[in-house]
Amino acid sequence: MLYIFDIDGVLAGVTHLLYLIKGENKDYDAYYSRIGEALPIAQGCEVLRAITMCAWTQQTYPHGDIYFVTGRSELSRETTIKWLQKHGACGERPNLHMRSNKDRRPAHEVKHDIIQRISQETGVPFSDMVVFEDDPQCAKMYESLGCYVCHVRHEKAKS
């Protein structure tokens, strides 16, 4: 199995920053400059840590079993890696896949291309991928490919 984790809304709480990228006056530079402030979402990070412990003992794929697929821009790669390391979510070199700096397509389109590339590079079929995702459009896209999707409730949702 490959385990695919989204970051924002699954591992990192960024609701306090969303005003920067919603509406007409989107300020992605400001958003990306502040994502290091994100607080960890305990439930998502605990699931990741548990899978990480199992994956280390039973690693089946040469590039590792855990991938991070995010709509974040490559501009934020170092900040994202530091955040993942700080919160115990990865080792030194995470399998981190991000959108290119100038790519402004919707997240589900970006992630579709990324997941296709991961499948081609690893030879792992979509049916052997477990995805943790909070965005409904992205979750639907993953499901349409045949991935097993754990649709994470948005961090602001109430029970």
Label for each model-derived stretch:
Residues 80-89, 117-118, 140-146:
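Short, aromatic/basic amphipathic alpha-helical patches
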Residues 44, 111-114, 135:
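Amphipathic coiled-coil/heptad-repeat helices and related helical stalk/stem segments
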Residues 2-105:
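Alpha-helical substrate-recognition element adjacent to the catalytic core
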Residues 1-3, 128-129:
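The start of beta-strands in P-loop NTPase/AAA+ ATPase cores
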Residues 126-159:
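Acidic, Mg2+-coordinating phosphoryl-transfer loop and its flanking beta/alpha structural elements
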Residues 61, 118-127:
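Glycine-rich phosphate-binding loop signature in dinucleotide/nucleotide-binding domains
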Residues 74-75, 110, 137:
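Short alpha-helical
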Residues 106-121:
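Short loop-to-alpha-helix "cap/lid" segments that border enzyme active sites
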